[in-house]
């Protein structure tokens, strides 16, 4: 009996010991997981302050000394700073994730726009995509302009010319040629009141922009080149509204409807400043450097520039990006808009520079004729003079623009065979 009692007492003692150990263990776990108690930090601090006051009242300063309170406050500040840093890191990671998802979404949208993936066909049958999808029109950009374009545009296309009082005489010749051909989708962007009144008198569709200090200053007083540079800012809204735009300088005579001669397979379709097949359409120019010996000949690809006074833009993202790039550079430096226009179109991507990925086409140089081709080549060649009737003639190579424009009308419209003869090839 005594042995059983002893064993029973030992067993009871073991259970008590185990219970104590479990309690200590749970207490340690709770101390680690909840160092400031089961309530929030503010409640803990209030409780700590309350206990501190109580302990001071009962004289138990040894348990909650001022040093202990300072240490707890210091720990709280440290943890708060760490928490703020973690929140900052979370925000940064969230932003990076958002940007990554945005980039992925853009890539997905581009794939959807271009179509599903396909396998390459047999040799000689593969053709790359050069016609980018058009944008979704946004009439909220400019409701007033949208209404005008809706009334005059044909198949969502329009000819646009910018003009101020300085080019009145040339504009009158151009308007007469437009009416003679029967083009109805022609719009003048009037840069001053004088041109606005001229358009009203001649029953020509016009658009006058809302007041803009930067544009108005150049538009009302600027010369030919200054006004020409404005088009890259003005045309953006036309594209955003979903219209194909054929930009025309005022020193151009229309002899046929140009819309019947466009291909519309590229973002940019422009006339050339070239005067023959090589200069207009490109050629391999060999650079000779004798000092290099065996490697003295270096091949270079050359083409004369696209003319920024007559070009067609489809309403695509690359076309709008082209306008943005050129307008941005023109706003920062005094440079020629035609030079910038071509640099953005032709310079390839390289370190520190990402090129514009716009498809481009050069127009037929005899249909969309510059004045060098006309006065230096065509008028001196009997066959060309007889057979070639251009769509437009752009008097871009000569300063006596008005006289030559009138001569073009006399020759091609009125049939006066010697109308072009009195002019020199170039300028005197």
Curated annotation (Swiss-Prot):
Membrane topology: Single-pass type II membrane protein
Pfam families found in the cross-reference section: Nucleotid_trans
TM segment ranges: 16-36
Keyword Glycoprotein among record annotations: yes
Sites carrying sugar chains: 40, 277
Cytoplasmic topology ranges: 1-15
GO MF assignments: glycosyltransferase activity
Single GO BP term: cell wall organization
Cellular component, GO, one term: Golgi medial cisterna
EC number(s) on file: 2.4.2.-
Keyword Cell wall biogenesis/degradation: yes
Segments in the Lumenal topological domain: 37-428
Keyword annotations: Cell wall biogenesis/degradation, Glycoprotein, Glycosyltransferase, Golgi apparatus, Membrane, Signal-anchor, Transferase, Transmembrane, Transmembrane helix
UniProt motif DXD motif: location: 249-251
Enzyme class, UniProt record, top EC level: transferase
Loss of function: phenotype: Reduced root hair length and content of arabinosylated extensins in root cell walls.
Domain notes: The conserved DXD motif is involved in enzyme activity.
Protein purpose: Plays a role in the arabinosylation of cell wall components. Involved in the arabinosylation of extensin proteins in root hair cells. Extensins are structural glycoproteins present in cell walls and its arabinosylation is important for root hair cell development and root hair tip growth.
Protein name stated in the entry: Arabinosyltransferase RRA3
UniProt organism field: Arabidopsis thaliana
Chain's gene name: RRA3
